[in-house]
Amino acid sequence: MSADYPTFKEALEKFKNLESDTAGKDKFNWVFTLENIKSAADVNLASKGLVQLYALQEIDKKINNLTTQVSKLPTTSGSSSAGAIVPAGSNTQGQYKAPPKKGIKRKYPA
């Protein structure tokens, strides 16, 4: 019957391994443990830190999503498509002509 359940030492090792895996996957190097939480102020501080960590992770996900969207934008590879981004310093002459200044009449306040 005892073979169905792990011993205390086996369970302890498993949880230690899980904790080290979590620490290894922690991207922001913020691993929260409940060791030193004794007062209500500690609880508030830890919950504030967890909220900040959650917000940072959400921001990181959004940045990753934006990065994938930006990398999918079309590039100008010889074709002059309407939505393409023009690289800096490229020749854009002939695409837009400013109106002649002779025909513009400005009214200046007296």
Curated annotation (Swiss-Prot):
Q: Where is this region: Disordered?
A: 72-110
Q: Where is the composition biased (Polar residues)?
A: 72-82
InterPro entries linked: RTBV_P12
**Pfam families, alphabetically?**
RTBV_P12
The Basic residues compositionally biased stretches are 99-110
Q: What is this protein called?
A: Protein P2
